[in-house]
């Protein structure tokens, strides 16, 4: 095993609901893209943001935040599972109400 301290993701649906997807253009080349604003993601799920540092001759030249899009997948899967549990409960309630009305 390569991993340790494995913990389930909690509150995934709420976290996903607090993320804001945006469209934007990159400053360097005006290329259009969609995604998230790293600073906003950091407020909701800090583990999804990494700091990219660029150094030259051991001197920090630039530093910026970046969203780790690959890790969002696990959060989305858990959020979908939470949604499905809600859907299943609502379907059961609807069925119970329909059965009771007939």
Where are these regions (language model features)?
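Active-site-adjacent helical/loop segments in soluble small-molecule enzymes
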Residues: 41
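A short, structured beta-strand/loop element
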Residues: 44-47
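Residues that recognize and position ribonucleotide moieties
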Residues: 34-35, 65
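Active-site-adjacent substrate-recognition loops and nearby beta-strands
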Residues: 1-5, 22-34, 59
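C-terminal intramolecular chaperone/auto-processing assembly modules
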Residues: 3-9, 51-102
């Amino acid at each position: 095993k390569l991993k340790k301290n494995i913990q389930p993701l909690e509150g995934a649906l709420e976290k996903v609901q607090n993320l804001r997807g945006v469209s934007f253009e990159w400053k360097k080349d005006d290329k259009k893209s969609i995604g998230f604003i790293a600073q906003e993601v950091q407020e909701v799920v800090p583990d999804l943001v990494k700091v990219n540092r660029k150094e030259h001759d051991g001197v920090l030249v630039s530093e910026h935040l970046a969203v780790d899009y690959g890790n969002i997948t696990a959060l989305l899967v858990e959020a979908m599972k939470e949604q499905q549990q809600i859907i299943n409960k609502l379907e059961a309630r609807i069925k119970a109400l329909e059965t009771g009305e007939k």
